[in-house]
Regions:
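Short, small-residue-biased leader/transition segments that mark boundaries at the very start
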Residues: 3-5
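Aromatic sugar-binding surface patches on proteins
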Residues: 129-140
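Short beta-strand elements
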Residues: 165-186
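Short, surface-exposed ligand- or partner-binding patches at beta-edge/loop junctions that are enriched
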Residues: 145-161
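Short acidic/polar inter-strand loop motif in beta-rich domains
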Residues: 35-42, 158-170
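Short nucleic-acid-contacting surface segments enriched for D/E, G, S/T with interspersed K/R
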Residues: 16-30
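OB-fold/S1-family single-stranded nucleic acid-binding modules
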Residues: 34-60, 175
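Short helix-loop boundary/capping segments
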Residues: 74-127
Length: 186
């Protein structure tokens, strides 16, 4: 097997995680690894699969039961390699059944180069006892304008979180200024 590091494929010398990924498939993961001194291969120490939700409009059938906005805390959020990446902190009991998605609004894309995104999070009635992290990587390449492929696109991201009193509120913290995505550059 091999892993792609910064657009360079490297054979895996040793996978200490015991993970298995089917042949001829790819998966977006976060990993701790070490490139061998001669640069010929890498040793993988840990792998974490990422949730990769493809943004869909509010009227998509996947949202037929409504837009769920159970609260999360954003630990970290950044642009990287044509993705909006984030680490979220969830309050969970079992941690099972949480569903994530991205609701997109592209009504301002052609005119102003803006994509509005809202985090869909259905905790599926999981009780809020413990902290657990979720790693999400939202693909952005579908917003590239074929006529102007280098055009910068402003990504505005909203999500539901907790206010200082512990009540759920929608945060627009990442809307002004948002994230300036330049295809192929960040």
């Amino acid at each position: 097997s091999e892993m792609c590091i910064r657009d360079r494929a490297l054979p895996v010398a040793e996978d200490r995680t015991g993970s298995t990924i089917a042949a001829n498939t790819s998966r977006r993961v976060m990993s701790n690894y070490e490139v061998l001194p001669d640069g010929s291969a890498a040793t993988i120490y840990s792998l974490q699969s990422l949730i990769v939700p493809v943004p869909k409009p509010e009227d998509d059938p996947v949202y037929k039961d409504g837009i769920k906005q159970d609260p999360v805390e954003v630990v970290s959020i950044w642009l990287g390699r044509d993705y909006l990446n984030m680490i979220l902190n969830l309050k969970v009991s079992t941690g099972k059944g949480h569903t994530f998605g991205i609701v997109e609004d592209v009504s301002e894309l052609k005119t102003n180069g803006i994509v509005n995104m809202l985090l869909y999070h259905d905790a599926n009635s999981d009780e809020e006892y413990y902290n657990r992290r979720a790693y999400i990587s939202v693909p952005l390449a579908q917003y590239i304008d074929e006529e102007h492929p280098g055009r910068t696109i402003n990504i505005k991201f909203k999500y539901c979180t907790y206010d200082k009193d512990g009540s759920a509120v929608v945060s627009e913290k990442y809307c002004d200024p948002g994230f300036d995505y330049t295809p192929g550059q960040n």
